[in-house]
Swiss-Prot record:
Stretches that traverse the bilayer: none
Listed name of the protein: Keratin-associated protein 10-1
UniProt KW Transport keyword: no
Cytoplasm in keyword set: no
Sequence repeats: 26-30, 31-35, 36-40, 57-61, 79-83, 89-93, 99-103, 104-108, 109-113, 121-125, 131-135, 141-145, 146-150, 163-167, 173-177, 183-187, 193-197, 198-202, 210-214, 220-224, 225-229, 244-248, 251-255, 262-266
Length: 282
């Protein structure tokens, strides 16, 4: 070879590129060795020797750094794919923990998105739409890349299995039938209306018939059995004012017609409900 030709023939790895000063047979198959043809760290851009004969012994081994598109065919095992930043990081069948090594990201398939005891709730990752398949999804095959899992904790109370509603961030987070305690949770937001729709009663415990939807829903309260303050969120205004906050009209009448029982005390008045008259006449 000419002296100006770049070559991988080098007995020392001191420089990234060496000027060819060794015999032409150095990079031929019969003398190829680590001391003669070293893919890394002497060379970081190529995996094969600069020679007319492509020597298989100069291919890179299956390591994280030299595993490029030009030398993955000789890697062992065969599932050493590109990094997890690439869509085709791992295939479904040969994907193992010691086989797919990420370069700049976490691997796409390693841990399940759901809990161990809820195999049916393994949903897709919020970052990778096709992370998990519905049929072949296993404990070592699903994980979100940059977000939290879609399903872990229920939005509703433990004793109300039928109230598991959708999350305000992920509308299709929970389905109505397989929704369990370890399968529903809002990811980045609160539920649709401040609190779960059918978990916390808007009314008092003594009046079960008035326990309607959340105070964000139109059919929240009925005038006969609604209670204020502690059961109503400050972020959601009730559609109807609690009955105990609305004194009767005679309360603001002259003192002669005012009864002591017509105006509730201050403790019954919430921040969102004010009496019809500013001060009881009686």
């Amino acid at each position: 070879m000419a002296a100006s030709t770049m070559s991988v023939c080098s007995s020392a790895c001191s420089d990234s590129w060496q000027v060819d000063a060794c015999p032409e047979s150095c990079c031929e198959p019969h003398c190829c060795a680590l001391s003669c043809c070293a893919p890394a760290p002497c060379l970081t851009l190529v995996c094969t020797p600069v020679s007319r004969v492509s020597s298989p012994c100069c291919q890179a081994a299956c390591e994280p750094s030299p595993c490029q598109s030009g030398c993955t065919s000789s890697c062992t095992p065969s599932c050493c794919q590109q990094s997890s930043c690439q869509p085709a990081c791992c295939t479904s069948s040969p994907c193992q923990q010691a086989c797919c090594v990420p370069v700049c990201c976490k691997p796409v398939c390693c841990l399940p998105t759901c809990s161990k005891d809820s195999s049916s709730c393994c949903q897709q990752s919020s970052c990778q739409p096709t992370c998990c398949a519905s049929s072949s999804s296993q404990q070592s095959c699903c994980v979100p890349v940059c977000c939290k899992p879609v399903c872990y904790v229920p939005t509703c109370s433990e004793d109300s299995s039928s109230c598991c509603q959708q999350s305000s961030c992920h509308p299709a987070c929970c389905t109505s039938s397989p929704c369990q305690q370890a399968c529903c949770v809002p990811v980045r937001c609160k539920p649709v209306c401040c609190k779960p729709i059918c978990c916390v009663p808007v009314c008092s415990g003594a009046s079960t018939s008035c326990c309607q939807q959340s105070s964000c829903q139109p059919a929240c309260c009925t005038t006969s059995c609604c209670r204020p303050s502690s059961s109503v969120s400050l972020l959601c205004r009730p559609v109807c004012r609690p009955a105990c906050c609305m004194p009767v009209s005679s309360c603001c009448a002259p003192a002669s017609s005012c009864q002591a029982s017509c105006c509730r005390p201050a403790s019954c008045v919430s921040l969102l409900c004010r009496p019809a008259c500013s001060r009881p006449a009686c």
